[in-house]
């Protein structure tokens, strides 16, 4: 039997940007082998909220027995989570997602382009960390609403060069990530040995289009979920080559190759 | 004193009365990775239809206070794939786990074809005739809201089925009793109660329904009092066994529904909050019974004697 | 930018769309001790019947996940006492507070008599015709579950009423649309949606229902998705104004129900959790609207223009 | 406008007998004039529990700005309450109950008999305290399941003599309070200037019968409530002289004269 449910303890929680929280959870889930892009499903401590909340795993620190989540408060669940104090125990399912970001195919000194937007960025941190640990050279390209909402800048810049696009131009390139890619990473498809993306639908579509023929390009999807393990069919997406075949994002994903699924 | 959790229903000799509800546990492969499904009393598989179905567009789920909405739309690989892959997979790994096959369709002919075929699978011990799915354009509620239509369909399905047929009734009706009576007269072995209520959530930003299907089926704790009422109401007019469901998350909930008249209990939404909900409930049942100085279910559900 | 919370419905020019729901706020005397009822948009008083009614035996309430059951059974002092004491008490203290009179009865003649009399009270601006109470042996659901019976009763009540008649429909029906259509054709000024679902709780110790009346009406957050669905469904077939209710506890809930098609909002069970629920919601509405760059309700409820 | 809702802070909470908790709440409700027998209605900190929980006021300490509740864990609400830690803020309605125990009619050195059972006993503590403060002589007669479940023994004995009955005879008289009254307080109706009772239905019926003609005998009722303020008609009881007249326990009670209502 695979392990699934963990009682993790809130080690600390910090608002690292307006409405963006860094949550460090301690417990033995941190000893599991986690592929970047995999996620956890958190039981929010409220009797009235039956569904768990999925969050990408932003960091695994086996030595300190902790994992880190980064999330934005968007509704009731994340609001309640953000008010939980240190020491609170949370029931967490994970690591979930049959397919995270594949990195085994990359060799030291090869180059990876990591593209992210907003709260799609958290799992890309663990990805970048794992790539750098392998000796892969990473380039980050991130989109945010504005300068204020940028988080984990230092953490990412430690791992590799990071280009920013903001909608209002308050930091880095003005405009969305797609335009930044066109202007400053026009040769990316040939320059980079692997492409990884996570973020809002628009960003994923941009990446899916631009890198549809790239043999090593991956996007991570989000969908409203119930079970998180593949049993309820809530989170399906259709195969591009045959839309009568449906995959489950929670189980067959959340990471898919570009050009693989209908966005 | 040790407890005896066994219950006995037509077609179903169960070591305990707890089973995952249809649609909330797939065909067992996923939760089977995490615990031994042999712990379960039985298992109701996802709806089977004649043809493979893609279901509705996403989003398919939304949250509500103490509940959730789903509009999966009966996605399933179709009877042939279920016979060829899903049921054999279960039979091989869990030869002693009684399977209840949930059957749905657009037309009477569809239902009949699927019942005939699926009831021949060696591990299918009973059929749960789904005439109450609120999330599909055809079939579902059409058959479930009229006593005549429900009876005709039941009769046709019973005629071709090799196993007892439990009819899953809808709570979305003015009076469930004439439907239950008609279904009983048509040869149903028992009832399955309840399917989901119809609900909707709206995103205040877009002012559009959250679910792509607009409406969805409301399940979870929120509907428990409605399930108790309907089980109680059907029990008051029939001695047929009832598989009760709707908002069961604890052993206490299970006993409450059994006190209302259910003979066995299906657990749906609770699996999502707590993937070990079923084994947890099974484990807690002896202590929960002991609270009332009981050690078995003999005194529950008035009809228990009859079986 | 300041907000304009006014809404305008037949008979009801409201400074804001929030009003206590019938049966959850008595005749105002109790909550009136704790805050100024002039803050309210309107107020739907407890059901009035021809004769004084004692209601059901106790226990009359039970708790459910995110909800509650009640089986008060329309206890009220009868139309004469309401005309002589309750309405004048309100008129004297809150001359500008529009009252909506909830009317119930055993027979058509009862309803008609009460409508005729109560609609003459100077502070009664509208009637809410209660054909959907699940907790009484007669009247209630009988009129509310058949389009013909509902239409006949509505017509008779509209004929004698000096104020617009809103008909309060039941969620406990297979299809609400033919009932809504029939009631509209019979002259209703609008709808009130929804009354409670029917539910039950059982005490696992005694294995008897907790409520003396056995079943009760399920209200509160748990039923919000059902209320949204029914308001949306009735809005899709009628342009008449809808007073929406069912599980509203926050300004966000109120906007969600208005986005579904409600023109005004009644708040029931939330008063019990939070006695200042109504004034709190009214206070929070401007900020809630501002979240979506709105400052009034003009773009809500498709029919708002018509009024 | 009358005050109604208070945000009270849990000062401390102790399990004083198996499943019996003493909960001290601090906040300005303690400055209100409280008649003994009045109650509070507590919002349990759980999103799924909509109804408040009524508890008698066991003690008011204006000097320390606290009130004390004593309660038994019987179901979900009291269970959750018992797990709330110090510092938790609770929304509390009160003081509720239009009619508590009348004591103004008593003069110093007059005698009062206070009869209670189980979790009906809490409000009798505040009653006894107020009576003793007036110089009234109090006698307590309390029933419990067994010795183990007795609570506040020292507190009551400080105020006046206290007789105990236990069902199993493990402490004091063996049997229920009615029998103890018959055997040891047979002249109570004439000996005592006032009689006060609170407890389970059987006890109240015993008191109601025995002291039906006493001009100064009172019982306090319980019923399942929703609003707690008289607006919802959940908690009615019928007048004995005319059962077509119904009173609300939350508002017209919870204290009634003996022989006043149908039990
Ligand atoms: C695989 C995966 C990984 C994710 N990783 C992150 C992350 O690392 N950081 C982060 O901030 N967010 C992440 N999200 C989004 C996050 O799950 C939602 O923001 C969160 O569930 C919202 O919960 P709520 O109660 O605050 O919002 P509400 O809107 O109140 O939630 C209501 C329901 O809708 C669901 N829901 C709402 N928004 C989303 C969404 N975008 N995706 C899926 N379900 C949603 C909720 O889970 C809940 O069931 C991820 C989503 C998925 C599917
Ligand atoms: C005026 C009054 C004063 C009270 N004072 C005390 C006190 O000082 N100490 C004490 O331990 N108990 C007291 N009670 C009883 C106390 O209110 C219940 O034990 C408590 O509400 C149970 O809540 P629960 O969630 O644990 O139980 P559950 O059974 O889970 O509660 C479910 C619902 O039933 C209601 N309920 C259950 N039992 C009772 C009951 N006996 N009376 C009224 N409602 C009930 C609950 O309030 C809730 O709405 C008093 C009751 C009333 C009416
Ligand atoms: C995601 C989901 C899918 C479901 N699919 C089916 C189905 O295929 N067939 C069926 O008869 N019922 C289906 N149901 C209804 C459940 O079997 C059950 O009747 C209902 O959810 C009430 O139980 P619960 O409150 O324990 O979830 C589904 C429910 C959910 C939540
Ligand atoms: C205690 C109680 C009493 C009620 N009495 C009445 C009534 O007299 N007439 C009526 O039409 N509805 C009555 N209702 C129904 C409410 O008016 C309302 O329709 C329903 O509770 C749904 O709203 P809510 O979820 O906000 O409570 C009552 C509800 C409750 C909880
Ligand atoms: S969330 Fe259940 S299948 Fe993906
Ligand atoms: S609890 Fe509402 S009237 Fe007493």
Swiss-Prot record, chains B, C:
Subcellular location: Cytoplasm
Cofactors (names): FMN
UniProt GO cellular component terms: cytoplasm
Database matches in CDD domains: DHOD_1B_like (cd04740)
Binding site for substrate: 46, 70-74, 130, 195-196
Enzyme Commission number(s): 1.3.1.14
Keyword Disulfide bond: no
MF GO annotations: dihydroorotate dehydrogenase (NAD+) activity
Domain of life of the source: Bacteria
Annotated GO biological process: 'de novo' pyrimidine nucleobase biosynthetic process; 'de novo' UMP biosynthetic process
Annotated binding of FMN, by residue: 22, 46-47, 102, 130, 168, 194, 220, 246-247, 268-269
Catalytic activity: (S)-dihydroorotate + NAD(+) = orotate + NADH + H(+)
Listed pathway(s): Pyrimidine metabolism; UMP biosynthesis via de novo pathway; orotate from (S)-dihydroorotate (NAD(+) route): step 1/1
InterPro entries: Aldolase_TIM, DHO_dehydrogenase, DHOD_1B, Dihydroorotate_DH_1, Dihydroorotate_DH_1_2, Dihydroorotate_DH_cat, Dihydroorotate_DH_CS, Dihydroorotate_DH_I
Function: Catalyzes the conversion of dihydroorotate to orotate with NAD(+) as electron acceptor.
Subunit structure: Heterotetramer of 2 PyrK and 2 PyrD type B subunits.
Protein name as catalogued: Dihydroorotate dehydrogenase B (NAD(+)), catalytic subunit
Naturally occurring in which organism (per UniProt): Latilactobacillus sakei subsp. sakei (strain 23K)
